[in-house]
Amino acid sequence: MWRIGIDEAGYGPNFGPLVMSAVACQAPSELVEADFWEVLHPAVGRCARRGGHLFVDDSKKVYQPGKGLAGLERTVHAFLSCLSHPGCHTLADLLQCLQTQTSVGPMIDEPWYHGGTTVPAAAAAADIASGSQNLKDALAQAAVCWGPIYSIAIDTPRFNGIVDRHGSKGAALAVAVVQLLRACLAHAPADDGLVIIDKHGGRNFYAPILQELCPDAWVVPIQEGMTSVYEVRWPQRVIRVILRPEADATSFEVALASIVSKYIRELCMEEFNAFWKTHVPHVKATAGYPGDATRFLADIRPTLERMKLPMDRIWRKR
């Protein structure tokens, strides 16, 4: 059976991409609702756990500004090593490896993006290799097959286009969820599964969004509210979908998806800040969140106007 987790990074900022990721694995039916922190405990652990484990936790606990990307990076690249795609040596490689077949090329309209940032950027190769081997051993012991992993990076121009078409920034999350789920479920069309999605915003009703997965599917609401639960039924399979707040605290796959999303967004923001630093040498780097983003915009505005860049190329409307 499939276990799939979905989470995002960058929904609230004014600058930089919204990144949403899905991580999936096939597990024996008796493990479909098991605690994977326990199942894979020889190789992985939460941030409070000591030792050489890969950290799988809320990305805000794994990564803290000023402490570098090594914690995120070691986990992401160890899990990527379980997939059968070529190695990733740059940010552009990483985005190419993780994009869905239907997603638009990443950041094609961002003036700051070049994709040449080398990855891994901070974690030592030996640390990644040891974590990867421990993970593969734990997965084999549990008879769990890891993958696929997908990410969608919605750059500012596309984010603003979605807002213009739908009148809501929440539509960007819906677009990404549908693309990611379609890509994951295409891997084994006859298998049942469990999908857990970290819920954001005030939406409680998701049946219309899930119906977009396939016109032939039958979406059955089981519960709608703070936590919303659905069954998506096809003639040959049933997928249970759970949307709940702070799911990265209780779902291993959601926590891992949050780490993948955060890692990609932080790499993107490094390129963002480096671009503006070359044009405005005195400007202090930003994470792109409200408040500080306003300060950053004021610092770069004269250069922005001189470059004749439209505001909606770099600044989100919502």
Annotate each language-model stretch with its function:
Residues 1-318:
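RNase H-like, Mg2+-dependent phosphodiesterase core
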